[in-house]
Design a protein with these regions (language model features):
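Conserved N-terminal entry element of GNAT/NAT acetyltransferase domains
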Residues: 1-14, 148-155
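Helix-loop element at the rim of GNAT/NAT acetyltransferase active sites that forms part
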Residues: 18-31, 71
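Active-site rim helix/loop that mediates acceptor-substrate recognition in acyltransferases
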Residues: 29-50
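Conserved beta-strand in the GNAT
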Residues: 52, 58-67, 84
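Conserved acetyl-CoA binding element of GNAT-fold acetyltransferases
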Residues: 74-87
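Conserved acetyl-CoA-binding loop-helix of GNAT-fold acetyltransferases
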Residues: 85, 91-104, 130
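Conserved beta-strand-loop-alpha-helix junction that forms the acyl-donor binding cleft
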Residues: 87-90, 115-126, 143-146
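Conserved GNAT acetyl-CoA-binding A-motif
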Residues: 106-118
Length: 155
């Protein structure tokens, strides 16, 4: 099965929230906006990118990349705030496709590092490591070169 990765549309948000229910359940009471409202806003913000994975026009996964300036990183840092995959689909392939797009987007936006919360599941950690992410304290990160800056990331 082929998986298409594309930028999320506002109409994708309900499905993305449904897929991420276990992940975002904790955050429902954390702030004034629920996950659905926040993701809807992120679709339009220039400091965030929301991606979905599609199979036969069904959303089967998604990822959120949030950007922030970082003096320590020497430019922008991209944070993979959310990455979810429908368990009925090929988790490895969908995760790989989403991470490829997230890293490409981070490089295009001038990020010098991409970070994420360190996965506790060994299989999930292996999927991230295949993309070059390494443990860095309580988080995992991948140093990337911004487009036009010379060296690119290695695998």
């Amino acid at each position: 099965m082929e998986y298409l990765i594309r930028t999320a549309r506002i109409t994708d948000i309900e499905r993305l929230v449904a897929l991420s229910d276990d992940v975002v359940r904790v955050s429902r009471d954390a702030g004034p906006l629920g996950p659905t409202d926040l993701l809807r806003q992120l679709v339009y913000l220039p400091t965030a990118s929301v991606f979905v994975a599609e199979a036969r026009r069904d959303v089967v996964g998604g990822a959120v990349l949030a950007l922030r300036p970082s003096v320590v990183a020497g430019g922008f840092a991209g944070t993979v705030d959310l990455l979810v995959v429908d368990p009925d689909h090929d988790i490895d392939r969908v995760t790989d496709a989403l991470l490829d797009e997230v890293v490409r987007s981070a490089q295009n936006k001038g990020c010098s590092v991409v970070e994420a919360v360190l996965p506790t599941d060994p299989a999930a950690r292996t999927r991230w490591e295949r993309h070059g992410f390494v443990e860095s304290g309580p988080r995992t990160e991948l140093h990337v070169a911004a487009v036009g800056a010379g060296a690119s990331r290695g695998r």
